[in-house]
């Protein structure tokens, strides 16, 4: 029997990074977004990894829509991917979608096996606000 995907599963599967025009393109400002329920799978053990994602960026021409980023990061839930690769991939996708002046993404993974990992990546040059 084929089961129809639940509405949340469909929304995650269809997720794309939706952006809108920067309402203040001439003004330097920063946007800070925290996503405290990020999950993916360890590519070596298959165990789940949990992290808090913290993004700070200075918008260029586009700003990312909040529900879209939530659904996008939820799409990693069942992917087997390293901490380093997932952090860099998310940053690359966000940069491609928004073309920011500057962006930093920090992935603060929960300790597992007495090891705590924080991966921080950035793009561009931070401007004074």
Curated annotation (Swiss-Prot):
Oxidoreductase recorded as keyword: yes
Protein name from the UniProt record: NADPH-dependent 7-cyano-7-deazaguanine reductase
Main location: cytoplasm
Compartments reported by the entry: Cytoplasm
One Gene Ontology CC term in the entry: cytoplasm
Binding site for substrate: 64-66, 83-84
GO biological process, one term: tRNA modification
UniProt keyword Amino-acid biosynthesis present: no
Organismal lineage: Bacteria, Bacillati, Cyanobacteriota, Cyanophyceae, Synechococcales
Family membership: Belongs to the GTP cyclohydrolase I family. QueF type 1 subfamily.
EC assignment: 1.7.1.13
Reaction catalysed by this enzyme: 7-aminomethyl-7-carbaguanine + 2 NADP(+) = 7-cyano-7-deazaguanine + 2 NADPH + 3 H(+)
Functional description taken from the UniProt entry: Catalyzes the NADPH-dependent reduction of 7-cyano-7-deazaguanine (preQ0) to 7-aminomethyl-7-deazaguanine (preQ1).
Domain of life: Bacteria
Positions of transmembrane segments: none
């Amino acid at each position: 029997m084929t089961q129809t995907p639940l509405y949340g599963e469909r929304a995650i599967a269809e997720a794309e990074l939706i952006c809108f025009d920067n309402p203040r393109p001439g003004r330097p400002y920063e946007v800070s977004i925290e996503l405290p329920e990020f999950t993916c799978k360890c590519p070596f053990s298959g165990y789940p990894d949990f992290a808090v994602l913290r993004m700070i960026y200075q918008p260029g021409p586009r700003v990312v829509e909040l529900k879209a980023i939530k659904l996008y990061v939820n799409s990693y839930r069942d992917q087997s991917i390293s901490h380093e690769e997932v952090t860099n991939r998310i940053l690359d996708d966000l940069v491609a979608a928004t073309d920011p002046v500057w962006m930093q993404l920090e992935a603060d993974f929960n300790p597992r096996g007495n090891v705590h990992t924080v991966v921080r990546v950035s793009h561009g040059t931070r401007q004074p606000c």
